[in-house]
Curated annotation (Swiss-Prot):
The active site is at D117 (proton donor). It is an enzyme of class 2 (transferase). It is found in: Cytoplasm. Pfam families: EPSP_synthase. Pathway: Cell wall biogenesis; peptidoglycan biosynthesis. Keywords: Cell cycle, Cell division, Cell shape, Cell wall biogenesis/degradation, Cytoplasm, Peptidoglycan synthesis, Transferase. This is UDP-N-acetylglucosamine 1-carboxyvinyltransferase. Belongs to the EPSP synthase family. MurA subfamily. Cell wall formation. Adds enolpyruvyl to UDP-N-acetylglucosamine. Its EC number is 2.5.1.7.
């Protein structure tokens, strides 16, 4: 039996909520703990399914991992394994983040090709080419990515695309390499800055985090640290869209609003009133939202992970919207599920055209990935009757206690087994 959410539409969401640490950061920080023998403690960790998955990966590499609410303690031995267990790795995409630390510490890594969300091709060629420029050899063998290096040396590296995952693996490989590494066209996401902040606290020498060019001067050894995970901007953005969709009033804490600057500007264009604070923001929507166009881009552009929420809002907005997806080619798969709910949408390659309706109609729908599932739940909040969202194990991988948090804002949502 699998869990589903039953969402009853028609409630205006109101209240305050605090987001926990970012899913897209905590898993990479856990991997970075491999770089430093001793005990690393991460606080403000989200209690999501992917954290125990990553804990299993690290245990398979020889670490001791303790999960205690929003605290994760990782004790890394002086000698670690280099072979990441297939059964643990195949559960989720972020497991490939151990590639850089293992290549750095062990001079060898064997990581099973990862699983995760079905949102399109996410090749590892930039991870491989980056490690090769640092002196490693890489190959795909028996379903695993294998990297080997007698030693790693700093290099000039320019990414074809500002890939978050490739940036992370190159950084974690370069911090213990001999010499200086310059990474051009690096990803600029807040999660990259969070990783760099932790690595610097561990003793790494890194300049330029948050810019297009990051410079790393290799050091001999890193030390374990205590580190607070940065707030989850995607979860925070989801709550912002929930407010706009339900014509609600939600205050979100635990997040730097600058991490969502463009998102909040788009909501203003849709008619929302937005107030920002040093550690949060408030979104109030009193009238029917206005149609807004979107195109996804790497940070500081509009995040692809919030595209499903933007589409959900557009389905009930006044006017026509065009959404362009520039990151993942299969991210519009969930639009078919939105059409089950009555959305007037048509897909043309990397674009979807949406003509807003006054209201959606309830129907059974199926989640194909974390963010699509959240978007379908938001759509259910404005559909008539009860909407059943199936395969919500995807949502559990990215949203801590999602039904409980929705109920705290006044939504009618329950978890059931079918």
């Amino acid at each position: 039996m699998k869990d589903s959410f039953v969402v009853t539409g028609g409630t205006r969401l109101q209240g305050a909520i605090k987001v926990s640490g970012a899913k897209n950061s905590v898993l990479k920080l856990m991997s970075a703990a491999l770089l430093a023998p001793g005990t690393t403690m991460l606080t403000n960790c989200p209690e999501i399914a992917d954290v125990p998955y990553m804990a299993e990966v690290l245990r398979g590499l020889g670490c001791e991992v303790e999960l205690d609410g929003d605290v994760v303690r990782i004790t890394t031995p002086e000698s670690i394994e280099y072979n990441a267990d297939f059964e643990a790795v195949r559960q989720f995409r972020a497991s490939v983040a151990v590639l850089g630390p293992l290549t750095s510490r062990c001079h060898k890594a064997r990581v099973a090709l990862p699983g995760g969300d079905a949102i399109g091709s996410r090749p590892l060629d930039m991870h491989q080419s980056g490690l090769e420029l640092l002196g490693a050899t890489t190959k795909i063998e028996h379903g695993c990515l294998v990297a080997e290096a007698e030693e790693l040396r700093g290099a000039q590296i320019k990414l074809d695309f500002p890939s978050v995952g490739a940036t992370e693996n190159i950084l974690t490989a370069a911090v213990l390499a001999e010499g200086t590494t310059t990474l051009d066209n690096a990803a600029r996401e807040p999660e990259i800055v969070d990783l760099c902040n932790m690595l610097v606290a561990m003793g790494a020498k890194i300049d330029g985090a948050g810019s297009n060019t990051i410079t790393v001067e290799g050091v001999d050894r890193l030390n374990p640290v205590d580190h607070e995970v940065v707030g989850d901007r995607i979860v925070a953005g989801t709550w912002a869209y929930a407010a706009a969709m339900t014509r609600g009033d939600i205050t979100v804490g635990g997040i730097d609003p600058q991490h969502l600057h463009l998102v909040l500007e788009k909501l203003k264009l849709a008619g929302a009133q937005v107030e920002t604070y040093p550690t949060g923001f408030r979104v109030v929507q009193n009238e029917r939202p206005k149609a807004v166009d979107y195109q996804t881009l790497p940070f500081p552009g509009f995040p692809t992970d919030l595209q499903p929420m933007a589409i959900a809002l557009c389905t009930v907005s006044e006017g026509m919207s065009v959404i362009t997806e520039n990151i993942f080619e299969s991210r519009f798969r969930f639009v078919d599920e939105m059409m089950r709910l009555g959305a007037d949408a048509s897909i043309d390659g990397h674009h979807v055209v949406i003509r807003g309706r006054e209201q959606l109609s309830s129907a059974p729908v199926w989640s194909s990935d974390i963010r699509a599932g959240a978007g379908l739940v938001l759509a259910g909040l404005v559909a008539d009757g009860k909407t059943e969202v199936h395969d919500v194990y995807h949502i559990d991988r990215g949203y801590p206690e999602f039904p409980e948090q929705l109920r705290s804002l006044g939504a009618e949502v329950e978890r059931v087994q079918r």
